[in-house]
Design a protein with these regions (language model features):
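N-terminal type II signal-anchor transmembrane helix
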Residues: 3-43
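Substrate-recognition/specificity elements adjacent to catalytic centers across diverse enzyme folds
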Residues: 26-216, 220
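Positively charged, low-complexity/disordered segments
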Residues: 221-224, 228
Length: 228
């Protein structure tokens, strides 16, 4: 009986030790995924030194001697603070969320692919002037520098949330930045569903004169100048 109890205690003790080791490893990886705002690092892609100063609210203030380095620093800071949001939003606009979240994301993926935002964003890059293109390229270079740093220094996954999902840190491109701006515009256009419903209703009306009933603007008889 004593031996049985000793065996049970050993199993329980071993399980506790193993659990503590696993928790310590997880904690270490999560801790490595949190950006270090106090460090000094050397990264490819900049001409002169950049300084990113964080205030008490961790808001970045970027100091650089030229515009390209400034946009580089902005991309780097965004990748430090918003990596999870940036990666998920890029998958959203590409219509690829179901690759990570499964079939429940199919409707949103289908909607995004119908809008074809990402292809339009790639075309939008070509339509930009040289100054804007350089800014987009420098911003993307800053993000990619952070990706390189994460992989080179084994900084976990770059964001704690990415430990839960196997999302690869693919290189960031100028089209990605434009695509996210277009996605934000779509999210801000919540009235589009009402516009579609109104258009379908107008098409279905048997009497064209009933259009006035659904118009957002009340159309009245023109006013003569002498009546103003």
């Amino acid at each position: 009986m004593v031996r049985v109890l000793q065996l049970i205690f050993r199993i329980i003790g071993g399980s506790l030790v193993l659990s503590l080791i696993v928790l310590a490893i997880i904690f270490y990886i999560v801790l490595r995924s949190i950006p270090d705002y106090e460090k000094t690092t050397e990264l490819p892609g900049i001409v002169e030194p950049i300084e990113i100063v964080r205030d008490t609210a961790n808001v970045p203030h970027i100091y650089a001697n030229n515009d390209n380095d400034l946009y580089f620093g902005l991309g780097y800071a965004h990748a430090q603070d918003r990596l999870w949001q940036m990666v998920v939003n890029r998958l959203t606009v590409q219509g690829r969320l179901s690759e990570i979240f499964g079939k429940q994301a199919f409707p949103l993926d289908d909607f995004m692919r119908r809008l074809d935002i990402y292809s339009l964003s790639q075309k939008s890059v070509d339509a930009q002037d040289n100054i804007t293109k350089k800014a987009l390229e420098a911003y993307a270079a800053g993000i990619n520098a952070r990706f390189l740093e994460i992989n080179r220094m084994s900084l976990g996954r770059g964001a704690p949330e990415l430990l839960l999902y196997n999302i690869p840190l693919a290189a960031w491109h100028p089209a990605d930045s434009i695509a996210l701006l277009k996605l934000f515009a779509v999210n801000s256009s919540s009235h589009y569903a009402k516009e579609i419903l109104r258009s379908r209703t107008l098409i279905a009306l048997p009497d064209p004169k009933r259009v006035i009933d659904l118009s957002l603007i009340h159309i009245s008889e023109p006013t003569r100048p002498d009546e103003i």
